[in-house]
Amino acid sequence: MRIFKKRKKRIGLALSGGAVLGAAHVGVLRALQEHDISVDFVSGTSIGAFVAAFVAAGKTWEEIEEIAKRLKWLDVSGISLPQMGLLSNKKMGKLLKETLGDITFEKAQIPAAMIATDIVNGEKVILKEGDIASAVMASTCIPGIFAPVKREGHLLVDGGVLENVPITPLQDFGADMIIAVDLIAHHHIQEPDNIVEVLLNTFDFMITNASRMYTNQADILITPNLSGASRVNMDQIPELIEIGYETAKEILNAEF
């Protein structure tokens, strides 16, 4: 008589974009660890790709929190005029390399993928091979704010244009359960105070409908209420982490 051992579900974690709101992802990671939930695959779009890079490298939520709390806007951006964006995110790539080294997708501890958009043909590009730092730079290039990144023959901008909550890469990996974090589900568009916020508001209008189309494919959806938070104020990072943690803890308590 053959006895079949029940196979453990392979869990995929999808981390959405949302600029500085991405700090809430760190709180979600804390809740996952406290529930002894191990992630087998991770995907990220925009700031979600930035966090996913650290997850893929095996960093703990405490290590990622320490990095997030130290971040300043000037650490991840620099003036790039007269190029195709107000700012460059080359500093972000440098920060990743300084923290993680020259890590590639192939050498990551956890299989990972990031989503970007080809600004020439409008197609979604799933990045899961080669250098992780350049993939994150491409996925975080909010159109008009950051200059596009050239990679593998593509001119790439933020993946949130087409799939802000990156579900499809996890399906491609073969995840049995997908936990998705949508940072903008409750976010209210506010009157902008500067050109960056004008562009972010425009970007938000573009990605809202696309997000809804994909989030209904998640098995567990975590939507922190960040309606009163700014997408550019880094002083609120500790509060965002706590909101992400409390929201995820409540949902995971009900599911596991």
Question: Where are the regions a protein language model picked out?
Answer:
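Patatin-like phospholipase
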Residues: 1-45, 50-256
